[in-house]
Amino acid sequence: MFTINAEVRKEQGKGASRRLRRANKFPAIVYGGNQELVSIELDHDQVINMEQKAEFYSDVLTLVIDGKETKVKVQAVQRHPFKPKLAHIDFLRA
């Protein structure tokens, strides 16, 4: 089982996302389960190591968002066109 630490995003938009990526983080979103969607930021180095395993895409993951655990599954992953970097992940509440 994978556990990922996340923080709620304070800023939205293209400029804020670019600043996150320069700080070795990237944006993500959590939705589903009759709850509000939550925009989060993830540490790239932590997630890229997990993402290389097949179980990352099929298992239920635990997101720790500001100290609160949420069970999620990966819905979609966006990657940089030519760099080995993640650009964005969509998580669906399990």
Curated annotation (Swiss-Prot):
Gene3D superfamilies from the UniProt entry: Ribosomal Protein L25, Chain P (2.40.240.10)
GO BP: any one term: translation
Source superkingdom: Bacteria
Keyword Ribonucleoprotein: yes
Cellular component annotations (GO), alphabetically ordered: cytosolic large ribosomal subunit
UniProtKB keywords: Ribonucleoprotein, Ribosomal protein, RNA-binding, rRNA-binding
Keyword Ribosomal protein: yes
A Pfam short name: Ribosomal_L25p
GO molecular function, a single term: structural constituent of ribosome
Its job: This is one of the proteins that binds to the 5S RNA in the ribosome where it forms part of the central protuberance.
Quaternary context: Part of the 50S ribosomal subunit; part of the 5S rRNA/L5/L18/L25 subcomplex. Contacts the 5S rRNA. Binds to the 5S rRNA independently of L5 and L18.
UniProt cross-references to HAMAP family, sorted A to Z: Ribosomal_bL25
Entry similarity comment: Belongs to the bacterial ribosomal protein bL25 family.
Name under which the protein is recorded: Large ribosomal subunit protein bL25
Species for this entry: Photorhabdus laumondii subsp. laumondii (strain DSM 15139 / CIP 105565 / TT01) (Photorhabdus luminescens subsp. laumondii)
